[in-house]
């Protein structure tokens, strides 16, 4: 009974903490991306690959030399992949940078709670908290209409079910046995797959710079 109570406590507390972090990070990203380029937003958001090992130092989770080398290679790859103009910080960039900080906290919170409770239950609690908290500003600052929701049904369902539901659940389950810095490096491949997806699905052309960025990022993970 004691173990069940402890696990239930960790599910609720972990779900609340993860949900709060995910809500803040997602909203900062979505607001910030309106005031910056997609490339810069992708690069700055993925800076959690640097922030996670830095924050980990204060939590007594020091990363080895090989990990830091991988982080450096990955950042270089991200820069080639995402940045096409000068990196000058604007209003949107600062919001996205704050988003990267909160995503760092999200990864570390998952690292703390995932070994202590069932990952799927934590994920379900996380999504409930994120949904409720995100609904508040939606009704305060937006005018949601069913016609608009139905018009965007496909991207909304994809983002809700696959990009959020499946992906974040797998993240929590997988981080039970994964180092947070390694997890952040793997998660940063999102930028690579988005570019490759545009090439395969949308027929977009890849520049030599982007190909080099993809190679560097895959090399960093390996």
Residue spans for each PLM region:
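C-terminal-most transmembrane helix of multi-pass membrane proteins
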Residues: 1, 152-154, 188-222
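Glycine-/small-residue-enriched transmembrane alpha-helix faces in small-molecule transporters
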Residues: 1, 17-20, 24, 28-34, ...
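Membrane-interface helix-cap regions at the ends of transmembrane helices
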Residues: 1-8, 54, 73-89, 129-152, ...
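Specific transmembrane alpha-helical segments of multi-pass solute transporters/efflux pumps
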Residues: 2-45, 78-80, 160-178
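C-terminal transmembrane-helix exit sites in multi-pass transporters
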Residues: 48-69, 192-211
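Transmembrane alpha-helical segments that form core, pore/gating elements
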Residues: 52-53, 88-142
């Amino acid at each position: 009974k004691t173990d069940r109570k402890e696990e239930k406590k960790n599910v609720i507390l972990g779900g609340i903490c993860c949900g709060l972090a995910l809500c803040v990070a997602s909203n900062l990203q979505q607001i910030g991306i309106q005031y910056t380029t997609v490339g810069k937003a992708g690069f700055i958001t993925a800076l959690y690959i640097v922030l996670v090992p830095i924050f980990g130092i204060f939590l007594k989770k020091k990363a080895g030399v090989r990990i830091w080398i991988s982080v450096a290679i990955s950042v270089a790859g991200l820069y080639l992949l995402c940045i096409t103009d000068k990196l000058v910080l604007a209003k949107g960039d600062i919001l996205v940078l704050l988003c990267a900080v909160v995503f760092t906290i999200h990864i570390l919170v998952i690292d703390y709670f995932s070994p202590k409770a069932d990952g799927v239950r934590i994920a379900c609690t996380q999504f409930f908290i994120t949904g409720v908290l995100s609904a508040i500003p939606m009704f305060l600052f937006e005018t949601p209409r069913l016609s608009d929701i139905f018009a965007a049904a496909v991207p909304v369902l994809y983002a809700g079910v696959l990009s959020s539901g499946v992906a974040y659940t797998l993240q929590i389950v997988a981080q039970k046995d994964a180092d947070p810095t390694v997890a952040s490096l793997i998660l940063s491949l999102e930028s690579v797959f988005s570019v490759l997806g545009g090439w395969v699905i949308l027929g977009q052309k890849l520049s030599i710079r982007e190909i080099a960025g993809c190679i560097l990022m895959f090399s960093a993970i390996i």
